[in-house]
């Protein structure tokens, strides 16, 4: 194995010798953890996050909030750390709100939630907050948040880029009020404004003016979490105007929140059951959730598996056959890499639609999936808004990740069925799924 430099290290993706049969404890949800951190930081009293995800993205969020003055105390309870606590089961973070202030520098890494959720928070701080990050973060659009905050009264220096690096000159408060944005490139633009909205003097009314809004489950997650801490939110689903969300100004409560497992990160393990004709159990799968990953139950069942919610968790079983699928993934775009990997191993073609916005994610995921699967012998074509996948006999080779955690897990799925696949920079999975290689080999009994 090449170990130097680290980012070009090759990880031999384990090949499954038979059907998997495993219980996999998936760590907490990144999306829930980072929203909860923001809401707790803006609350009027301390709160707790239990079983938070400890990964690069969430540690960046915690570090950024600390930079602005928020207290975050991390504790681990050995009595509740099941199986060593690698799933975060014994961990709890106490968040102690404080007056937000600069000067401060925030490293966003390549975390969309950090780069988009925190500029509105910084506008409430007293003093300048500078945002910087990985080179790829400079290419990811922030204009939706920047333009909206300026319209609401914030002062931001970005040299006209509409992207990082930038500085928010916080004035200690923000007027807020109505604002129109085009969030068609990322639903995080809407969530970012809603999360801080209760602290704006007039609250906020966000009107989406663009084409189809992607990843709606993530906006529903934001709304649910706001309501859980006492915010009043009017939404299109609750009888409000289409594409308009209103948050009333008011104090947020400090809560004691237990973070759900990250269902999107359960995807490779469920895919392993599907691809090998085996069985995987994911404990603590919620009966009701706004996480996009819950859609996997329906999608992977259509592709040949079956699932049941039991007292043990979600029990997913493969049939030994993998079928192609024609599916609109606009609401669950983050699942695309894993679905594409399974589709490349199917017995019939697949069409994945509604995910043009993936070109703006951690990498251009559509171009990356096309290139990497085809270099293993596949037949994938980019369409205007997705991928067309015709299964072919695949062979081994290097699967590049482009510093994208979901590309790495997609390559691992293919490696189950194709001998000789090597994943470049599997360590990028630490962005949202720490210890992925150990969880993966543990599932296989290696």
From Swiss-Prot:
Binding residues for 3-phosphoshikimate: 30-31, 35, 186-188, 215, 334, 361
Cited PANTHER family: AROM/DEHYDROQUINATE SYNTHASE, PENTAFUNCTIONAL AROM POLYPEPTIDE
Enzyme Commission number(s) from the entry: 2.5.1.19
Keyword set includes Protease: no
InterPro entries: Enolpyruvate_Tfrase_dom, Enolpyruvate_Tfrase_sf, EPSP_synthase, EPSP_synthase_CS, RNA3'P_cycl/enolpyr_Trfase_a/b
Function: Catalyzes the transfer of the enolpyruvyl moiety of phosphoenolpyruvate (PEP) to the 5-hydroxyl of shikimate-3-phosphate (S3P) to produce enolpyruvyl shikimate-3-phosphate and inorganic phosphate.
Reactions catalysed according to its record: 3-phosphoshikimate + phosphoenolpyruvate = 5-O-(1-carboxyvinyl)-3-phosphoshikimate + phosphate
Protein name: 3-phosphoshikimate 1-carboxyvinyltransferase
Lineage, opening ranks: Bacteria, Bacillati, Actinomycetota, Actinomycetes, Kitasatosporales
């Amino acid at each position: 194995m090449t170990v130097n430099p680290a980012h070009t290290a090759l990880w031999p993706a384990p090949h499954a010798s038979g059907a998997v049969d495993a219980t996999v404890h998936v760590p907490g949800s990144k999306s829930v953890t980072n929203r909860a951190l923001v809401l707790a930081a803006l609350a009027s009293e301390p709160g707790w996050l239990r079983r938070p995800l400890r990964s690069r993205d969430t540690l960046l969020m915690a570090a950024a909030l600390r930079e602005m003055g928020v207290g975050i105390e991390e504790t681990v309870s050995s009595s509740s750390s099941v199986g060593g606590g690698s799933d975060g089961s014994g961990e709890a973070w106490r968040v102690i709100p404080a007056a937000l202030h600069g000067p401060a520098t925030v490293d966003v890494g390549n975390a969309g939630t950090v780069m988009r959720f925190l500029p509105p928070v910084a506008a409430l701080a007293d003093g300048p907050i500078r945002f910087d990050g990985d080179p790829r973060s400079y290419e990811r659009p922030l204009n939706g948040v920047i333009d909206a905050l300026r319209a609401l009264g914030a002062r931001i220096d970005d040299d006209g880029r509409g992207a990082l690096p930038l500085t928010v000159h916080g004035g200690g408060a923000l007027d807020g009020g109505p604002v129109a944005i085009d969030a068609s490139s990322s639903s995080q633009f809407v969530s970012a404004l809603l999360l801080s909205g209760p602290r704006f003097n007039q609250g906020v009314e966000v009107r989406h003016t663009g084409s189809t809004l992607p990843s709606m489950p993530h906006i529903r997650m934001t709304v649910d979490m706001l309501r859980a801490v006492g915010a009043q939110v009017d939404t299109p689903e609750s009888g409000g105007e289409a594409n308009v969300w209103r948050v009333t100004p008011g104090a947020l409560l400090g809560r004691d929140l237990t973070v759900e497992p990250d269902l999107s990160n359960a995807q490779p393990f469920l895919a392993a059951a599907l691809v090998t004709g085996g069985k995987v159990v994911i404990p603590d799968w919620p009966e009701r959730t706004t996480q996009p990953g819950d859609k996997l139950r329906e999608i992977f069942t259509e592709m040949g598996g079956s699932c049941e919610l039991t007292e043990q968790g979600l029990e997913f079983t493969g049939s030994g056959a993998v079928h192609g699928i024609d599916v609109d993934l606009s609401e669950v775009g983050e699942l695309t890499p894993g679905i594409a990997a399974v589709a490349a191993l199917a017995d019939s073609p697949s069409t994945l639609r509604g995910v043009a916005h993936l070109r703006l994610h951690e990498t251009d995921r559509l171009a990356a999936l096309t290139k990497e699967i085809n270099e293993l012998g596949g037949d994938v074509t980019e369409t205007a808004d997705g991928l067309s996948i015709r299964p072919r006999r695949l062979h081994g080779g290097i699967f590049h990740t482009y510093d994208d955690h979901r590309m790495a897990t997609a390559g691992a799925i293919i490696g189950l069925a194709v001998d000789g696949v090597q994943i470049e920079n599997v360590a990028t999975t630490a962005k949202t799924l720490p210890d992925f290689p150990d969880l993966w080999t543990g599932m296989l009994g290696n």
